[in-house]
Amino acid sequence: MSNQLNTMDIKEILKFLPHRYPFLLIDRVLDFTPGETLHAIKNVTINEPFFQGHFPVAPVMPGVLILEAMAQATGLLAFKTMSDEPSNDALYYFAGIDNARFKRVVEPGDQLHFEVKMIKERRGIGVFTGEAKVDGELVCSAEIMCARREIAK
């Protein structure tokens, strides 16, 4: 494998993920190796719409959105593994999750780091492990599955 650093800025992320505000939860990819790993970040600010109701007095990022961001990172790794070009003909859908565990809260001002690893891919189903961390401290871990599906037109 090459030692070349592979990154993605928000413009490239938007080419691969169908998500848009307020549901796009990946800001940048710091490094990836197709078929192996991807390291992405989400900058969590007080301006996130979910903080209005979760919780106004003590804002905490909902765990389900941490998992969704992790799933978006797996989708990026899947796209980069299967094809280097974005496709308008197929998407990777969040297909399953196992062994999700939460270890600490995520608050405004935190920077979430996602490390996802591809375990296997078979017949369009990818299996990944993922961890989310803040300041090197584990926030969440999970096993995630995503499925490649053609878009009906």
UniProtKB/Swiss-Prot annotation:
EC number: 4.2.1.59
Molecular-function annotations in GO: (3R)-hydroxyacyl-[acyl-carrier-protein] dehydratase activity
Name the record gives this protein: 3-hydroxyacyl-[acyl-carrier-protein] dehydratase FabZ
Main location (coarse class): cytoplasm
PANTHER family hit by this protein: 3-HYDROXYACYL-[ACYL-CARRIER-PROTEIN] DEHYDRATASE
Keyword Cytoplasm: yes
Function: Involved in unsaturated fatty acids biosynthesis. Catalyzes the dehydration of short chain beta-hydroxyacyl-ACPs and long chain saturated and unsaturated beta-hydroxyacyl-ACPs.
Gene Ontology CC terms: cytoplasm; membrane
Single GO BP term: lipid A biosynthetic process
UniProt cross-references to HAMAP family, sorted A to Z: FabZ (MF_00406)
Record keywords, A-Z: Cytoplasm, Lipid A biosynthesis, Lipid biosynthesis, Lipid metabolism, Lyase
InterPro entries registered for this protein in UniProt: FabA_FabZ, FabZ, HotDog_dom_sf
Entry annotation: catalytic residues: 54
This protein's record includes keyword Lipid biosynthesis: yes
SUPFAM superfamilies reported for this sequence: Thioesterase/thiol ester dehydrase-isomerase
Reactions listed under catalytic activity: a (3R)-hydroxyacyl-[ACP] = a (2E)-enoyl-[ACP] + H2O
Gene from which the chain derives: fabZ
Coiled-coil segments on the chain, per record: none
Subcellular location as annotated: Cytoplasm
Family note: Belongs to the thioester dehydratase family. FabZ subfamily.
